[in-house]
Amino acid sequence: MVKFSKELEAQLIPEWKEAFVNYCLLKKQIKKIKTSRKPKPASHYPIGHHSDFGRSLFDPVRKLARTFSDKLFSNSEKPEILQVRRRRGSSETGDDVDEIYQTELVQLFSEEDEVKVFFARLDEELNKVNQFHKPKETEFLERGEILKKQLETLAELKQILSDRKKRNLSGSNSHRSFSSSVRNSDFSAGSPGELSEIQSETSRTDEIIEALERNGVSFINSATRSKTKGGKPKMSLRVDIPDAVAGAEGGIARSIATAMSVLWEELVNNPRSDFTNWKNIQSAEKKIRSAFVELYRGLGLLKTYSSLNMIAFTKIMKKFDKVAGQNASSTYLKVVKRSQFISSDKVVRLMDEVESIFTKHFANNDRKKAMKFLKPHQTKDSHMVTFFVGLFTGCFISLFVIYIILAHLSGIFTSSDQVSYLETVYPVFSVFALLSLHMFMYGCNLYMWKNTRINYTFIFEFAPNTALRYRDAFLMGTTFMTSVVAAMVIHLILRASGFSASQVDTIPGILLLIFICVLICPFNTFYRPTRFCFIRILRKIVCSPFYKVLMVDFFMGDQLTSQIPLLRHLETTGCYFLAQSFKTHEYNTCKNGRYYREFAYLISFLPYFWRAMQCVRRWWDESNPDHLINMGKYVSAMVAAGVRITYARENNDLWLTMVLVSSVVATIYQLYWDFVKDWGLLNPKSKNPWLRDNLVLRNKNFYYLSIALNLVLRVAWIETIMRFRVSPVQSHLLDFFLASLEVIRRGHWNFYRVENEHLNNVGQFRAVKTVPLPFLDRDSDG
């Protein structure tokens, strides 16, 4: 049977862990009570009380007598063992705050210090739970009211657009707004009268906007004026994210409802913008739907919070009764049940209301469909996945041993064949090997995050029912590696069987083509949600300045900075097959080309450039100067990478000095950011020396070892300036080994980066995502 302390640890919300009942602390206090209580002489107890300590032959008789006396006398005549008083607390400003509970002991326990300490801590835990629950409940209730207003606004907008569409289909000629005439008129030859009319109509539009804002309705980027390519002025009024052209005819409306209706009517009065408006409405609807899902999730977490804490109080009081030999739980639990976090039913009622609203507006009155959105069920771990992981791991090891034997027997690495083999096979197979290693490290990250209760799905904003799990990551990695080694074995067998080199050397290209087809396959096979999510993130990284940067975006950007050798191998592979060098076996066609050599700089710069642009975008959105400082880290890395490439081609003392200077500066920059910013370590004032106050791993030595390991792997670039004289095969293997070390370092870095982000969420009790709403209410926005 699982102990409740472990069950509580497994079920509690990680981000709210500090707000839960400290069950372990109370349990330790009960153990202290048990050890401190010793048998006392009978004279120390009140008349009529029998000691519970010691055994005798008369115990059954005494028990029967106590039972008979309990039935004989009414319970009202029994004195209370304890009394829990409730009072109003006060803040520093003197205002009343939450209710405070305080237990007063009477009779037996008034003389026992350990019992006093226990109930004092129990009161603290009860007050802590109430003080956390009430603000959270208020926050969710206010969020629910805002979402209902947003939904009403959305419904009215949809109705106006629908009515407008019906009028257009029926052939009725609706009156065009002033903004439509502005777009259709030629202002290059406009008269002063036309300009004055424009100004008067514009002022009327501004008056309507001001009137609406005075009554609490705000428009995002209201009354923004711009010019089209033809020089025609245009007014953009945004209620949502749409750039809809606005105008108004007549004076200010008599009421806010009328003004809103007039303004919305004008927003959709242009037939040309019907498609755009519907698209914007759909975008707003998607945001509101996501907000309702997050609200329901938050309410569910708060409900779980209440129930788990109630169970914890019940369990701990039963333990106390067992140790003390008294029935103190009934009195205290009555108070707990009357406290705010249990007695309030607002959360449950709001959950029911959200279910009905979501079913009606977003699921076509299909409750089953609605609950799939509100309560997505995560698929259970399949033993079949574990079986295939083991199967492919065994296949990979067997095929790799076969490959080594065949390579030795065929003499593929002799001086006559090694250049041909390395130029055709090494780049493509290295791509898959590095990718598989990265996937394996990511699987290790997922395993560690799960075991340490780090909520990575919330941090990365993954859907819980489609998020990749560690077994799936291991399956993908072992599948890739088995396929790669199988292709290498087939390549050697066909090469030794007398097939033409041009035919055999197409095998790596075929393998790469299969991988690309699997990646973009539209069918729901082989983890389609994960594949498409990966493609979307890559698109956002490539266009990083133009997209809002989320945690998962810059996390993936950091992964790319560790895969520059993989990108260089892709460059070589692309040139090799596009130039059809596999037919002529002229391997130096690419390497000696000027464009190929210059493209190497671009490939090495791109991951750092994308990451720097993400920092710029985050600085633009958040106005945090730390993002600009972080951008400097990637700029220094770009400089160091470019200097190293040049030094590999221009081997002289000048470039050696530049490599040393640029690499040392970049490494110090990166190490500081790794330890202080990304990991949150090296805090001299921390209670854990040179670490941080909160640690997920219990053994502090892991953090010190990780700091040392990251330091060693960060300076692996020193190999590039040592000028080892090795053969081409050894040189390629050394490059692959260093690239693998960087992938391992990145996987090691990933755990502590996400751990630090998780602890930031814990410190702010952030367990629910805040979805930005489409319609801005000035009063609610503050």
Curated annotation (Swiss-Prot):
CDD domains linked: SPX_PHO1_like
Region (Important for inositol polyphosphate binding): 315-322
Domain of life assignment: Eukaryota
GO terms for cellular component: endoplasmic reticulum membrane; Golgi apparatus; Golgi membrane; plasma membrane; trans-Golgi network
Domain EXS: 591-782
Major site of localization recorded for this protein: Golgi
GO biological process, one term: polyphosphate biosynthetic process
PROSITE patterns: EXS (PS51380), SPX (PS51382)
Keyword Endoplasmic reticulum in annotation: yes
Molecular functions per Gene Ontology: inositol hexakisphosphate binding
Consequence of gene loss (knockout): Strong reduction in plant size and biomass. Severe deficiency in shoot Pi level, but normal root Pi content.
Effect the entry attributes to changing Y23F: In PBC; decreased Pi content and reduced growth
Region annotation (Disordered) ranges: 165-202
Domain SPX: 2-334
Induction or repression: Up-regulated by sucrose and Pi deficiency in roots. Down-regulated by auxin, cytokinin and abscisic acid (ABA). Up-regulated in leaves following treatment with ABA. Down-regulated by the transcription factors WRKY6 and WRKY42.
Further facts: Pi content in shoot of pho1 mutant can be restored to wild-type levels after treatment with cytokinins.
Record family assignment: Belongs to the SYG1 (TC 2.A.94) family.
Subunit structure: Interacts with PHO2.
UniProt name for this protein: Phosphate transporter PHO1
Annotated source species: Arabidopsis thaliana (Mouse-ear cress)
Taxon lineage: Eukaryota, Viridiplantae, Streptophyta, Embryophyta, Tracheophyta
Name of the encoding gene: PHO1
